[in-house]
C-alpha cells in the first residue's frame, strides 16, 4: 500500500466502507445511539457523513442515482466492528431499536459475535475477542503474503 499522505478530510483507516442511507442525519443519530459511533465530518445538510468507530471509520452517503440501501430480504454486505463486550453492546443496540439477527454466540476461533440490522437494512456484525487461537486449531489456515 505504501505510505499514505495524511489528510484531515478523510479517515485514516485503510479500508473505509461507504454505506447508503435514505436519511444521512437520521442514520448518524441512530448509529451513535445504538452502536456508539461518533460523527467526525459532515458534508452538506444530508449528503454525507464520516463516522469514527474505534480506530476505524465508515462513511454514510445519501440516496442518488443508482446508490441505495439494501432492499428488504437482501444481504449485500456485512460490516464487522470489534467491541470490548459483545453482550453489553447487543443490549445497547436492542434498547435503541436494532433488529438483532443473531444473539451473542461464542465461536471456536476465540470470538463472541452477534449481528444486527439497522433501520436502512445494513447488516452489522460485532465481535469481542475472548482469547487468541491459531487458525489451524479450528480449521483455518495461515497464509503468508509474499
Model-derived regions: residue spans:
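Vicinal oxygen chelate
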Residues: 2-18, 28-117, 127-146
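Short, surface-exposed ligand-recognition loops at beta-strand->loop->(often short) alpha-helix junctions
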Residues: 19-23
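C-terminal catalytic core of tyrosine-transesterase DNA break-rejoin enzymes
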Residues: 120
Amino acid at each position: 500500500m505504501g505510505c499514505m499522505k495524511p489528510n484531515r478530510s478523510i479517515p485514516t483507516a485503510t479500508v473505509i466502507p461507504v454505506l447508503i442511507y435514505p436519511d444521512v442525519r437520521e442514520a448518524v443519530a441512530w448509529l451513535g445511539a445504538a452502536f456508539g459511533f461518533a460523527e467526525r465530518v459532515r458534508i452538506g445538510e444530508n449528503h454525507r457523513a464520516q463516522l469514527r468507530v474505534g480506530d476505524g471509520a465508515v462513511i454514510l452517503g445519501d440516496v442518488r442515482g443508482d446508490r441505495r440501501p439494501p432492499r428488504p430480504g437482501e444481504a449485500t454486505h456485512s460490516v464487522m466492528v470489534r467491541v470490548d463486550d459483545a453482550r453489553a453492546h447487543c443490549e445497547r443496540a436492542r434498547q435503541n431499536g436494532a433488529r438483532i439477527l443473531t444473539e451473542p454466540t461464542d465461536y471456536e476461533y476465540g470470538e463472541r459475535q452477534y449481528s444486527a440490522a439497522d433501520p436502512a437494512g445494513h447488516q452489522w456484525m460485532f465481535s469481542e475477542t475472548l482469547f487468541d487461537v491459531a487458525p489451524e486449531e479450528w480449521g483455518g489456515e495461515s497464509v503468508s503474503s509474499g
